[in-house]
Amino acid sequence: MTQPVAKRFPTPSIDRLPDDIRTRLLAVQEKSGFVPNVFLTLAYRPDEFRAFFAYHDALMDKDGGLTKAEREMIVVATSSANQCHYCVIAHGAILRIRAKNPQIADQIAVNYRKADITPRQRAMLDFAMKVSIEANKISEQDFTDLASHGFSDDDVWDIAAISAFFALSNRMANVTAMRPNDEFYMMGRLPK
């Protein structure tokens, strides 16, 4: 039995979407072989889709002091804390691929403090979790600790922005009952 993309809101047909959104979905499908359900779910509200993915791309696709794998570590750790099934599975797949490590996503999702990561990455995730769960407790000491691990002000901003953005994503995925695509489960687990 085929599961719905998201249970609580209608999923628009790709051929009925605005041209720019349809073009993006088809490009993603061509590159990955499938359309991730987040695209189909959020296409229900085209203006919000555009804003969401513009900010996503600005945070996740740029060069900077954080590697793309480290950005995905933030997503997986905070999404796990927020109990977001979709984001843990989907971004876990991306993390496995970007880190070239089939075990890292599971380790981070279960308990990043015991994962095979560097002290710098642990400090990054400690701060990301604080932003995600108890941002009201952020203090100057957090910035001092991050600086001692070599993070610049822009890096700290990126850690915070990724954590905050995916808090929105986690909540929308849970509200819509978004289902991870089956393809995500095995991605990055086996050598090509």
Predicted segment positions?
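Hydrophobic alpha-helical segments
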Residues: 1-192
